[in-house]
């Protein structure tokens, strides 16, 4: 029922959209449904979500970059493949890596924070690629602030949110 609802909603979006978590899981084995989107879109899978959508990732980073670039172009979306490094690819073939490692971000809810940051940037008029790049960087910086304050083991996604102001106040970061 949820899978059908997600698939049925895709062509009705009128503003740029982010698909994460259960929206991606609803497309399991049906990535061609992404082509029904009529607006710019960002998908933000981690490795397991990627596997359900597209199949397993290669092991070598250069092969990961290649396949992410290929899928972004094929399905006309911006992809933020979460991991270390996070691989961001546009539908036009541009690929970027954000390499900050922080095990404190590998927790449930952290991807929701990332999606929220990216969505806020999209709402301000940034392109999907700009929002994905800047949002991923802001998320990593806020995660680093939280890690320094609390340690990676004890930090929570809410601590990343609390650290956003530190990132924005430090003008040299932006």
Predicted regions and their residues:
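Glycine-rich phosphate/dinucleotide-binding loop and adjoining beta-alpha-beta core of small-molecule
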Residues: 1-100, 173
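Interfacial segments of multi-pass membrane proteins
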Residues: 118-123, 139-140
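Hydrophobic, well-ordered secondary-structure elements that form the walls
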Residues: 20, 112, 131
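Short, well-structured alpha-helical segments that form the helix of a local strand-helix-strand
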Residues: 64-73, 128-142, 157-165
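Short glycine/threonine-rich catalytic loop with a Thr-x-Gly-x-Asp
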Residues: 101-118, 128, 153
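Extended hydrophobic-aromatic, low-complexity segments
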Residues: 54, 96, 107, 128-132
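Charged C-terminal helix
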Residues: 143-174
């Amino acid at each position: 029922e949820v899978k059908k609802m997600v698939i049925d909603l895709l062509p009705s979006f009128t503003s740029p959209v982010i698909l994460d978590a259960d929206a991606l899981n609803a497309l399991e084995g049906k990535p061609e449904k992404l082509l029904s989107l009529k607006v710019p879109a960002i998908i933000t899978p981690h490795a397991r979500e990627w596997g359900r959508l597209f199949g397993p990732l290669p092991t070598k980073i250069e092969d990961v970059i290649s396949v992410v670039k290929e899928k972004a172009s094929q399905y006309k979306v911006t992809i933020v493949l979460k991991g270390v490094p996070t691989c961001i690819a546009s539908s036009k073939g541009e690929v970027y890596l954000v390499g900050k490692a922080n095990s404190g971000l590998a927790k449930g809810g952290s991807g929701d924070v990332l999606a929220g940051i990216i969505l806020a940037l999209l709402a301000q008029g940034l392109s999907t690629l700009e929002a994905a790049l800047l949002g991923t960087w802001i998320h990593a910086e806020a995660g680093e602030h939280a890690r320094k304050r609390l340690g990676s083991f004890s930090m929570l996604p809410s601590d990343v949110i609390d650290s956003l102001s530190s990132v924005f106040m430090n003008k040299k970061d932006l």
